[in-house]
Amino acid sequence: MRKLFVFILLLLAVAVSAQTDKAFMTVDWGKIKAEVEANPQRVQQLVDILINVDADTTLTAKDKILAVYGRTYLNNGRDLLMEFDMSKARNEGKFDKAAAIADKVLASNPLNTNAIVSKIYNFRILVDKEPDKSWMLSDSLKVYSVRLSRILDTIFMTGDGSKEYPFSVTAVGDEYNLLQFFLGIFKVNGQSVVGTCDRLVLGETNKNYSSPDIYFDVKRVFEIEKSMFNSQGGDGK
């Protein structure tokens, strides 16, 4: 899979280099939730533009943040259980099965980064197995790679990875996908919860990210997981 990592990193290199010495926009969850409740159709329209490989240039940074983070209030984690099954299949090396489940996950939440990665994994394998179809598969691979790039670029806008300004995520998978496919960091030596943040201790650094640890704001992740637990009959305590 290292070849795949290198492939995607090449696609994302321009996005990373363009954000050197960036300014960032922290996520105002209360404001985003209010905007979703007031106009859910607009949020969905922004999502549709974001995932359209030919249309994203019309979106401002604020629009992208509203799309990526507002979408969670439209879906409320309904894709989470399917994502568990998908990740299990992928970890077992059943990439075709994972890709099939990923289609269902993306039908529920088109911004699920783990599902997008599962599709990319499978397309990359098929390109090697079926070279006569590589032109068609490469087009599909590009579509999902661009979508992943846009989502991760939006996450990257929300902080600098410090405890004071953590990157905001809506799923744990976003953390590792940002590390691997956007920052090019593959080694993590440890993880801990610090307040409402996940802190990852890194086993390597590079020119894209030089700090020894990285923080992610997981407030929304906790809310989604609690909501799912309650819907499954838990007491939420």
Residue ranges and their predicted role:
Residues 1-24:
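Bacterial Sec-dependent N-terminal signal peptides
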Residues 4, 9-12, 123, 224-226, ...:
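Residues in flexible loops and secondary-structure boundaries
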Residues 4-5, 141, 191-194:
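Residue-level detector of intrinsically disordered/flexible regions characterized by low predicted structural confidence
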Residues 6, 34-41, 51-55, 107, ...:
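Generic surface-pattern signal
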Residues 19-99, 163-237:
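N-terminal alpha-helical interaction modules that lie
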Residues 61-153:
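Alpha-helical protein-protein interaction scaffolds
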Residues 136-177:
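Long, positively charged binding patches that form subdomain-scale interaction surfaces
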